[in-house]
Regions:
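A residue-level marker of the well-folded mature domains of exported/periplasmic proteins
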Residues: 26-37, 41-398
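C-terminal motif of bacterial Sec signal peptides marking the signal peptidase cleavage site
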Residues: 16-19
Length: 398
C-alpha cells in the first residue's frame, strides 16, 4: 500500500489541482434533516458500471465548505475523479454550519447510505464519534476516514472498527519544511494563521515553528512569529482585520492553514504587499488566477505545505473496489517522508516562488527528515508548545 501511494501521490495532486479551479455552482442541493445539507454532483448521475464492490461513493465533511481550495476540496476532487473514471455514482454531504453536532454528522452518514453509498469518505477528525456509531450501524459499509485516528473514534482504547480505514499524515514535517524554507529565503517576520486548533492544524503550525527556528539557528539570526487560531475554517472581515494588523505591523509572510481561511490572509497580503504560504494542496494557482482576474496585484503565494490527500483517498477506494479491504481493515495509515513522498513543498518550476532558497537546500533538509537525522516533534496538543531556541520569538495570540 505504501509503495502504491508513493507512485500515485503526484498524479492525484495534479488531478486535484487541475479541477480545483472549477466552481461548485454546477452542484445542485437538496435539504436534509437535522440542520444538514446534502448535495449531489449533477455529473455523477450515470448508472454505476464496471464495479463489483463499490456501488456508490459519498464524501461527508465535518465542517467547512466543499470549495475551500484546500482540505475538503482536495479529498473531493479525488472522489469525483475516481467516480468519473470508474462510472460510479458519487455524492457529497455537508453540515449546514460550523456548529454541526455529532448527531448532524450521523445524519449525513445515514443519508449517504440511504442514497446508495456503500463506501463513505469521512473527512475531518470531528467525524470520530459519528464513525463509532456508523461503523456499528452499517457493518457492510466501508469507511475511509481522513485526518481521523483510532482515539478520535474510541477515546479510551483507540480501537478502529474493521470496516474503517483511518488515514493521517505527518503534517509537522510539511510545516517544518515551509518554516525552514521561508527563513532560509530571507523572511524574518513570520505568521501562522490556523483555522481551528485541531490536531492536523496544530501539527502543521508546530512544525512551522520548529522549521523556522532551525533555519534561524543555522543562519545565526533572530526571527519573530505571530501565531493565532481563528476558530473557523473560512475567511471573514474579522480574520482579514487581524491579518491587516499583522502585515501592517511588519509580518512578511503568513502560513494560512485551515480550509478557506486563507482568503482573509490573501486579501490582507495583497493590501500590504505581503506573502502567503498555502496548505494541503499546491495553492499557487489561486495566486496566478487572482492576478489574471485582477483580484490581486501580484501572486502572494511563496509555496504550500502539502499532504497527499488525493493519493490516500484514491488508494482507499482502489482497495475497496479490488476486494482487498482486509489488507487495511481496522488500521491507521500515518504517512510522512519515512513512508514515501507523502508530504512536502511543490517543486515544479511554476510553483517555486522562492528568491534565494534553492532546490538543493530543500532536498537536503527533506532527506534529513526522511532518514531521521532531523526529528520533528509531532505534538498535537495545543497546550504543549514546541521547544525552541533563543533564535525565535513566538507570540501565541488568543
Amino acid at each position: 500500500m505504501k509503495k502504491y501511494l508513493a507512485l500515485t501521490m503526484a498524479a492525484c495532486m495534479a488531478l486535484s489541482l487541475a479541477a480545483c479551479g472549477s466552481s461548485a455552482s454546477s452542484i445542485t442541493s437538496s435539504s436534509a434533516a437535522a440542520s444538514t445539507e446534502a448535495t449531489s454532483d449533477s455529473a455523477a448521475t450515470a448508472e454505476a458500471t464496471g464495479s463489483a464492490n463499490i456501488t456508490g461513493i459519498a464524501q461527508c465533511c465535518d465542517v467547512g465548505t466543499l470549495d475551500d481550495e484546500s482540505f475538503n476540496q482536495g479529498c473531493w476532487e479525488a472522489v469525483k475523479g475516481y467516480g468519473d473514471e470508474s462510472g460510479i455514482e458519487y455524492n457529497y454531504y455537508l453540515p449546514s454550519g460550523e456548529d454541526a453536532s455529532d448527531e448532524d454528522r450521523e445524519t449525513l452518514i445515514r443519508q449517504a447510505v440511504a442514497d446508495g453509498a456503500n463506501t463513505i469518505v469521512c473527512v475531518g477528525y470531528l467525524y470520530g464519534p459519528a464513525l463509532a456509531w456508523g461503523a456499528t450501524e452499517y457493518p457492510d459499509v466501508h469507511f475511509i476516514a481522513v485526518d481521523v485516528n483510532g482515539f478520535d473514534i474510541d477515546s479510551e482504547n483507540g480501537t478502529i472498527p474493521e470496516n474503517v480505514f483511518c488515514v493521517t499524515f505527518k503534517e509537522e514535517e510539511a510545516g517544518y519544511l515551509a518554516g525552514y524554507a521561508a527563513v532560509k529565503d530571507g523572511f524574518t517576520k513570520l505568521g501562522f494563521l490556523g483555522g481551528m486548533a485541531v490536531p492536523a492544524v496544530i501539527r502543521y503550525g508546530y512544525g512551522y515553528v520548529q522549521g523556522a527556528d532551525a533555519a534561524a539557528q543555522e543562519l545565526g539570526i533572530n526571527v519573530q512569529m505571530n501565531y493565532y487560531y481563528g476558530g473557523q475554517f473560512y475567511g471573514d472581515e474579522k480574520i482579514t482585520a487581524k491579518m491587516d494588523g499583522w502585515y501592517d505591523g511588519g509580518t512578511e509572510v503568513v502560513f494560512a492553514c485551515g480550509g478557506g481561511i486563507w482568503t482573509s490572509a490573501a486579501e490582507a497580503a495583497d493590501k500590504h504587499d505581503g506573502k502567503l504560504i498555502g496548505v494541503d494542496v499546491d495553492q499557487n494557482y489561486l495566486g496566478v488566477e487572482g492576478v489574471e482576474s485582477g483580484k490581486y496585484k501580484a501572486n502572494p503565494f511563496v509555496t504550500s505545505a502539502m499532504k497527499g490527500l488525493g493519493a490516500a483517498v484514491k488508494n482507499g477506494l482502489d482497495t475497496v473496489n479490488a476486494g482487498d479491504w482486509s489488507t487495511i481493515a481496522g488500521t491507521n495509515g500515518n504517512f510522512g517522508l519515512e513512508e514515501g513522498d507523502y508530504v512536502g513543498l511543490p517543486t515544479d518550476e511554476a510553483s517555486w516562488n522562492f528568491s534565494t532558497f534553492t532546490m538543493d537546500e530543500y532536498n537536503t533538509v527533506l532527506e534529513k527528515i526522511r532518514n531521521g537525522e532531523i526529528k520533528v516533534d509531532n505534538t498535537s496538543d495545543d497546550a504543549t508548545k514546541p521547544t525552541t531556541s533563543s533564535n525565535i520569538t513566538v507570540d501565541y495570540q488568543v
